[in-house]
Swiss-Prot record:
GO terms for biological process: L-histidine biosynthetic process. Its EC number is 4.3.2.10. It comes from the Bacteria. This is Imidazole glycerol phosphate synthase subunit HisF. Heterodimer of HisH and HisF. Gene3D superfamilies: Aldolase class I. IGPS catalyzes the conversion of PRFAR and glutamine to IGP, AICAR and glutamate. The HisF subunit catalyzes the cyclization activity that produces IGP and AICAR from PRFAR using the ammonia provided by the HisH subunit. Keywords: Amino-acid biosynthesis, Cytoplasm, Histidine biosynthesis, Lyase. Pathway: Amino-acid biosynthesis; L-histidine biosynthesis; L-histidine from 5-phospho-alpha-D-ribose 1-diphosphate: step 5/9. Belongs to the HisA/HisF family. Pfam families: His_biosynth. It is an enzyme of class 4 (lyase). It catalyses: 5-[(5-phospho-1-deoxy-D-ribulos-1-ylimino)methylamino]-1-(5-phospho-beta-D-ribosyl)imidazole-4-carboxamide + L-glutamine = D-erythro-1-(imidazol-4-yl)glycerol 3-phosphate + 5-amino-1-(5-phospho-beta-D-ribosyl)imidazole-4-carboxamide + L-glutamate + H(+).
């Protein structure tokens, strides 16, 4: 059995790590490189960095800190933010990132996924999906440009359909960001994640809702995701990564300790 991964997420805005609630009201939580180093030392399996306003502001993720992170940590890390071209992706990988993640630019041009996959291989192409549960229609919809509240907009895509489309285009991994759960620490959306798991043939990462160690146990055992991403519980010291991994191991979840 493949070990489940614990993935701290660092949202980056203007060179600082920030965290919001339901993608709004972001506050500064620390500096990029020290936080990355801390999580690597605490036993994280991987890190994800999102430059949250890059796509909305029509720019690309700042490369200056990518090489500094690569020098300080020895675990894989993924970067995201406004990557729209092969050249931009190549630059980020050359600076030391192991994977690149595409979200809003893929919604604008789905064929970007296939082009990136052809150039770099599926294994380093991650698709982030910001999924919002619309109670009025009882449906899951994909939103775009979510890093800037003023720029966020609805798309034509239902989440299930977009998951199938990005796989068809050649993505290697999917991060499902459940917007309704983001930052509220009430648990992952097991229902939605289980539904997506049933149509997802690539590794699936759960994002949004972690508040306790039991939430991680539940998302692994009930939704069968490959990794669980979280931010505020790690930034605020609510959960220690080593203690979390021991807890999961004690609950028969395969993890690297």
């Amino acid at each position: 059995m493949l070990a489940k991964r614990i993935v701290p997420c660092l949202d980056v805005k203007e060179g600082k790590v920030v965290k919001g609630v339901q993608f709004r009201n972001h506050e500064i939580v620390g500096d990029i490189v020290p936080l990355a180093k801390r999580y690597a030392e605490e036993g994280a399996d991987e890190l994800v960095f999102y430059d949250i306003t890059a796509s909305a502001h029509d720019r690309v993720i700042d490369k200056s800190w990518i090489s500094r992170v690569a020098e300080k940590i020895d675990i894989p890390f993924c970067v995201a933010g406004g990557i729209r071209t092969i050249e931009q992706a190549r630059e980020k990988l050359a600076f030391g990132a192991d994977k690149i993640s595409i979200n809003s630019p893929a919604l604008t041009d789905p064929s970007l996924i296939a082009r990136l996959q052809d150039e770099f291989g599926r294994q380093c192409i991650v698709i982030g999906i910001d999924s919002y549960y619309d109670a009025s229609s009882d449906s899951y919809r994909v939103k775009q440009f979510t890093g800037d509240e003023a720029a966020t907009k609805d798309t034509q895509w239902y989440t299930q359909d977009w998951v199938e489309e990005v796989q068809k285009q050649g993505c290697g991994e999917i991060v499902l960001n459940v917007m309704n759960q983001d930052g509220v620490r009430q648990g992952y959306d097991i229902k939605q994640l289980s539904m997506i798991r049933s149509i997802c043939d690539v590794p699936l990462i759960a994002s949004g809702g972690a508040g306790t160690m039991a939430h991680f146990r539940d998302v692994f055992s009930r939704a069968n995701v490959d990794a669980a991403l979280a931010a505020s519980v790690f930034h605020k010291g609510i959960i220690d990564i080593q203690e979390l991994k021991q807890y999961l191991k004690d609950n028969q979840i395969a993890v690297r300790v």
